[in-house]
């Protein structure tokens, strides 16, 4: 069989797809057929490019399609999802053909080239992981409204159903931005900068010239702002170890050195509930809010996680819900979204339901120090050299986004904040840089207030006030937590110090 049977010499995409077929034959243990195909397709000179990560995505989709068409799978969700993939492929094809027909230069390649040739999917050097978006799903619990619509189920009552059961209502570009999807296209993770990466201060110092104290992709204005204290309260006379804010319920949770957690009403500054933590010292808390309760997952510097529920019926009521056991090494990082994910020092990452039921685990490579959920199965991982995107479901790395050792990654309402020793970087929900704040003190944590970065170091906070880098002393003892919150209908931040003192600060604008 000739070379032309499998590919066209002038199109790199055929090499990538042929490589996929070859990989599939090997995985199915058809070594003889794989060898013949490899030779006849002329893959001996094939050199993988940046598009290679798509092969894993293609293989997963191809495997599912094959299972459905061969009758090995009769699962209704699989059938519907495959139909959804096919429909999205066809719709994208027609949409780009239509755009190219109306304005051949609109695709970014100019001229009067055939619109199909203009579609980036046909260029191997383009990020072929665009196809990953076509294979994605949306989190069914992330929003009460249906993210996908299946015309066959138009008469079905009730709120949203799983994304696997239908098709997108809009093109992903026009989907609501307030809800993180269960799958995000890796194309959306790319920084638009020339190098594709944001460098940490340790790397920036080795370059000529000094970076500005404050960078903004959105641009700055002439306004000058500051912070004004509006409330002070002390939830406990003991040392505050960590805290977490439930913004929707206006509740502050403070873990103290006497091994208790206290729930404080941010509108009144009064304690509403306190619970003992079974003689376990809580050192970190992450939460998930619902209409009538707050799920609190607590790190205790051990190989276990403590699960606490805060029911919201009239007032907050804290109670211990259980302990998550199973790790054989100490847990170094954990995250909460629609599930709980925990990573131990041995590289084992486990997934749990919000009720504490174990679901699965993966063995990860490298010394990962921090994890942060981008969506239910997409994560940002940070090790000693970089920050990168990882797909937990497929167990593959997607791409690197930042260089340097991050001290922490915080998921916020408007995206993510990555903290380095002297730098805080705000990334939006598509993992693209929005603002960078550089300070000359060691940063402990950072947050946003009305679109402005505020970084905490020791007793002080740093921010760009519109004209210069400003520094304000918030507490007499070290700041242990700094979070954005909207109290009294004003952009605010809440700070907690080691002494147990908590303060709410509002943003004011002046000359």
From Swiss-Prot:
Domain LisH: 13-45
Polar residues: bias regions: 197-210
Region (Disordered): 172-212
Domain of life: Eukaryota
InterPro entries: LisH (IPR006594), WD40/YVTN_repeat-like_dom_sf (IPR015943), WD40_repeat_dom_sf (IPR036322)
Pfam families reported in the protein's UniProt record: LisH
SUPFAM superfamilies referenced in this protein's UniProt entry, alphabetically: WD40 repeat-like
Stated name of the protein: Uncharacterized LisH domain-containing protein ECU04_1490
Organism name: Encephalitozoon cuniculi (strain GB-M1) (Microsporidian parasite)
């Amino acid at each position: 069989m000739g070379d032309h049977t499998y590919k066209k010499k002038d199109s790199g995409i055929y090499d990538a797809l042929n490589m996929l077929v070859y990989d599939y034959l090997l995985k199915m243990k058809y070594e003889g057929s794989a060898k013949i195909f490899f030779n006849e397709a002329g893959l001996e000179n094939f050199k993988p490019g940046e598009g290679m990560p798509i092969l894993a995505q293609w293989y997963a989709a191809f495997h599912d399609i094959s299972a459905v068409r061969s009758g090995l799978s009769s699962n209704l969700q699989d059938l519907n999802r495959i139909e959804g993939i096919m429909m999205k492929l066809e719709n994208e094809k027609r949409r780009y053909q239509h755009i190219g027909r109306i304005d051949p230069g609109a695709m970014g390649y100019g001229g009067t080239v055939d619109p199909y040739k203009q579609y980036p999917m046909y260029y191997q050097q383009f990020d072929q992981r665009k196809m990953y978006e076509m294979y994605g799903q949306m989190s069914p619990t992330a929003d009460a409204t249906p993210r996908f619509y299946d015309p066959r189920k138009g008469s079905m009552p009730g709120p949203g159903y799983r994304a696997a059961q239908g098709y997108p209502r809009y093109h992903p570009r026009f989907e609501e931005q307030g809800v993180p999807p269960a799958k995000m296209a890796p194309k959306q993770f790319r920084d638009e900068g020339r190098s594709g990466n944001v460098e940490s201060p340790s790397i920036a110092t080795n370059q000529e010239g000094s970076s500005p104290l404050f960078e903004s992709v959105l641009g700055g204005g002439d306004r000058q702002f500051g912070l004004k204290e509006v409330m002070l309260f002390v939830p406990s006379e003991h040392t505050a170890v960590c805290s977490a804010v439930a913004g929707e319920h206006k509740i502050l949770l403070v873990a103290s050195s006497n091994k208790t957690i206290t729930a404080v009403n941010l509108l009144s500054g009064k304690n509403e509930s306190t619970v003992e933590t079974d003689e376990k010292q809580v050192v970190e808390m992450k939460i998930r809010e619902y209409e009538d309760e707050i799920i609190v997952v607590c790190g205790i510097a051990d190989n276990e996680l403590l699960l606490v529920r805060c029911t919201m019926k009239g007032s907050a009521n804290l109670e211990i819900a259980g302990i998550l056991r199973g790790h054989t090494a100490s847990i170094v990082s954990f995250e909460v979204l629609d599930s709980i994910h925990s990573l131990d020092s041995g590289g084992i990452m486990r997934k749990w339901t919000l009720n504490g039921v174990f679901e699965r685990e993966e063995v990860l490579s490298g010394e990962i120090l921090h994890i942060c959920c981008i969506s239910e199965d997409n994560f940002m991982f940070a090790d000693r050299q970089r920050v990168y995107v990882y797909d937990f479901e497929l167990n593959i790395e997607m791409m690197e986004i930042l260089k340097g050792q991050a001290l922490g990654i915080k998921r916020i309402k408007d995206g993510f904040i990555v903290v380095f020793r002297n730098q805080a970087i705000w990334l939006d929900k598509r993992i693209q840089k929005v603002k960078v704040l550089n300070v000359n003190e060691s940063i402990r944590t950072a947050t946003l207030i009305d679109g402005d970065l505020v970084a905490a170091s020791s007793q002080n906070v740093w921010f760009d006030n519109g004209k210069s880098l400003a520094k304000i002393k918030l507490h007499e003892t070290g700041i242990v937590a700094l979070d954005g919150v909207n109290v009294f209908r004003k952009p605010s931040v809440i700070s907690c110090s080691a002494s147990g003192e908590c303060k709410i600060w509002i943003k004011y604008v002046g000359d």
